Amino acid sequence: MAVAFEVVAEPNRRRILDLLRDAERPVGDLVDALAISQPAVSKHLRVLRDAGLVEVRTDAQRRLYRVRPEPLRDIDEWLQPYRRLWSKRLDDLERHLDEMVEEERS
């Protein structure tokens, strides 16, 4: 999981994952969307692939990349307790603000 965190810390790699979230794409589509060079996109894809976050398949002349969700699920599971913590704190803040509004009206 630590490797996945290190890999997704880079903004272009997160953007690549975002672009691949809904559908597999060839490198050219990623280059166009990111506005960075093809070698740079390929380097990021290699890092993502080495970390197990994306996989590639060949379709005729094209190499299509897609997200592998399994490593991201590990991150999601690790983050779950923190989501509950923040959800509770935000709920507490909302209650406090509602009480302040009620006190001002009284």
Sequence positions of predicted segments:
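Short, intrinsically disordered or compositionally biased N-terminal tails of bacterial proteins
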Residues: M1-A4, S106
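Short helix-coil-helix linker/hinge
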Residues: V7-N12
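Base-recognition residues in the alpha-helical recognition helix of bacterial helix-turn-helix
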Residues: D18, S42-R46
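C-terminal regulatory/oligomerization modules of transcriptional regulators
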Residues: L19-A33, Q38, D50-E55, E70-S106
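Short, Lys/Arg-rich nucleic-acid/phosphate-binding segment
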Residues: T58-L64
